[in-house]
Amino acid sequence: MVNCIIKNWQGEEVGQATLELKVAKEENAAHIVHRALVRQQTNARQGTASTKTRAEVRGGGRKPWRQKGTGRARAGSIRSPLWRGGGVTFGPKPKDFNVKMNRKERRLALRTALDSRIEDLIVVENFAEQLTQPKTKELVSALTRWGIDGNQKVVLIVSEITDNIQLSARNVPYIKLLKADGLNVYDLLVADKIVATAEALSKVQEVYSDS
């Protein structure tokens, strides 16, 4: 169990929140998180890269010149891989890169990744009411009050993404906005700081519990 200080919109400490997640054993933690990370990045590949072989390129059915007597090198097709405009040898073809991982393993990896970033976790009160209209400047100022440098990558975890929060955060390149039930290993690991509302933390506890 981990106790986290809760900060309000002004950056003042107003309470504590607890987070209790079942994580992987220390000797297995790095391995299972790595597997989940590789799976996520691999499954993001489209796998649509495609080239044509000499059999698929248009043309080249006729021998360009006779076999002997011209003094030129032998050639059987103008679509040989040696020729400009010819087919590609061993080029990419459409491929399914999908990697499977058991649901329990995925959740264990995500809990382990989140637990490894506890030192960089900042818990705040729900601030949806403070953003009565889309204001990027107000959100950035709040991040500063919460102790976040302007050059740090931030994952902002909320229970519900309101229009005002989304519009306030979308123009800031270093902010990644996520719902509590839509976390992923990559964003948790790559961020410098993780900011979560108290409601979102409870949602994480509920959604990603070991049950």
UniProtKB/Swiss-Prot annotation:
Top-level taxon of origin: Bacteria
A GO-annotated cellular component: ribosome
Task: Identify the keywords attached in UniProt to this record, alphabetized.
Answer: Ribonucleoprotein, Ribosomal protein, RNA-binding, rRNA-binding
Region Disordered: what ranges? 41-78
Q: Where is the composition biased (Polar residues)?
A: 41-52
A molecular-function term among this protein's GO annotations: structural constituent of ribosome
Q: Locations of Basic residues compositional bias? A: 60-71
The leader peptide range reads: none
Task: List the SUPFAM superfamilies.
Answer: Ribosomal protein L4
Gene Ontology biological process? translation
What the entry lists under InterPro entries is as follows:
Ribosomal_uL4 (IPR002136), Ribosomal_uL4-like (IPR013005), Ribosomal_uL4_dom_sf (IPR023574)
How it assembles, according to the record, is: Part of the 50S ribosomal subunit.
The record's function comment reads: One of the primary rRNA binding proteins, this protein initially binds near the 5'-end of the 23S rRNA. It is important during the early stages of 50S assembly. It makes multiple contacts with different domains of the 23S rRNA in the assembled 50S subunit and ribosome.
What PANTHER family does the database record attribute to this sequence? 50S RIBOSOMAL PROTEIN L4 (PTHR10746), LARGE RIBOSOMAL SUBUNIT PROTEIN UL4C (PTHR10746:SF17)
Family under the similarity heading = Belongs to the universal ribosomal protein uL4 family.
Protein name, entry field: Large ribosomal subunit protein uL4
Its taxonomic placement starts with:
Bacteria, Bacillati, Cyanobacteriota, Cyanophyceae, Oscillatoriophycideae
Q: Which gene encodes it?
A: rplD
